[in-house]
Amino acid sequence: MSQPPTAPPVTQEIPLQCEDELGRPLTFVSSFGYDPGDPYAVWLTFHIPGGDVHWAMARSLLATGIDEPAGEGDICLWPNLDSDGRAVVSMDFHSPEGRLVVEARTRDVYQFLARTWAVVPPGAEADNVDLDELVDELLAG
């Protein structure tokens, strides 16, 4: 049986840039989060007027999106350059309520990922899942 992790969650505030409906640049703060108890996922919380918006994606998707286009459907990521020529990760989020395309500086995203890898290295995610608990949850419906 795998034992649940004892490491605390990793969180990091990362500024995101986007454009409003009139094409004006906007910057807002987002929280990127990682819980070793859910080792395959990262969580993004967009702190925007009207309330926080939460998204989850695979940690491997975020890592891939730093270097090459990744994802399909609800979340797509790709490396890009901002208007000042700085490396960014572009992220395109689709939901029934709308679409949001944002950019985060690559160095910020990489710093966050490096902190998650220090807690649970890539490829070691399965070691951090309590399989008995997972089966119990699935059977409980």
Task: Show the residue positions of the predicted features.
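Charge-rich, low-complexity N-terminal segments
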Residues: 1-41
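Generic detection of short hydrophobic beta-strand segments and adjacent strand-loop junctions
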Residues: 12-16, 55-56, 102
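A structural detector for beta-sheet-dominated domains
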Residues: 17-19, 45-47, 78-80, 94
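Residues that cap or initiate secondary-structure elements
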Residues: 22, 36, 50-52, 83, ...
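Short, well-structured hydrophobic secondary-structure segments
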Residues: 25-70
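Generic recognition of long tandem-repeat/solenoid scaffolds
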Residues: 44, 89-93, 102
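Short, internal acidic amphipathic alpha-helical interface segments
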Residues: 52-96
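Mixed-charge, glycine-accented linear interaction segment located at domain edges/termini
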Residues: 94-141
